């Protein structure tokens, strides 16, 4: 409720031209002031970096590519099974690439 109220007040007091704003805010509490900030568009003529693993026109992987991103993807190929992609936390063991996906596994499954 407080977050919605602060955002509403903030937008009313600090209106900006344009359709998109980002609110700079962490944990909103009674004493925090939330300030809006404009989204900075790319300069005219600039293009976002091209991903060599992905064909932007078709939204598909390029020929020979196995993956386009992820902690277990390197140069469009799956990283070998067993490579640590995320270190252990608490009682969980290290997370390791499977060799079958560009993504690092989310959970461990025990038999």
UniProtKB/Swiss-Prot annotation:
Disintegrin domain segment(s): 45-111
Its job: Acts by binding to alpha-IIb/beta-3 (ITGA2B/ITGB3) on the platelet surface and inhibits both ADP-induced platelet aggregation and platelet aggregate dissociation in human platelet-rich plasma.
Signal sequence segment: 1-20
Organ and tissue specificity: Expressed by the venom gland.
Annotated protein name in UniProt: Disintegrin subunit alpha
Annotated S-S bridges: 53-76, 67-73, 72-97, 85-104
Protein source organism: Agkistrodon piscivorus leucostoma (Western cottonmouth)
Gene Ontology MF terms: toxin activity
GO CC terms in record: extracellular region; plasma membrane
Pfam families: Disintegrin
Pro-peptide region(s): 21-44, 110-111
Keyword Secreted recorded: yes
InterPro entries linked to this entry: Disintegrin_CS, Disintegrin_dom, Disintegrin_dom_sf
Domain of life: Eukaryota
Family label: Belongs to the disintegrin family. Dimeric disintegrin subfamily.
């Amino acid at each position: 409720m407080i977050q919605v109220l602060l955002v509403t007040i903030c937008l009313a007091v600090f209106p900006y031209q344009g359709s998109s704003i980002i609110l700079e805010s962490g944990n909103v509490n009674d004493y925090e002031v939330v300030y809006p900030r404009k989204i900075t568009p790319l300069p005219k003529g600039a293009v976002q970096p091209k991903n060599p693993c992905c064909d932007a026109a078709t939204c598909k992987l390029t020929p020979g590519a196995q993956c386009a991103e992820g902690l277990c993807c390197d140069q469009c190929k799956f990283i070998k099974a067993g490579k640590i992609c995320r270190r252990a936390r608490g009682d969980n063991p290290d997370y390791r690439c499977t060799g079958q996906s560009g993504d690092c596994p989310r959970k461990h499954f025990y038999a």
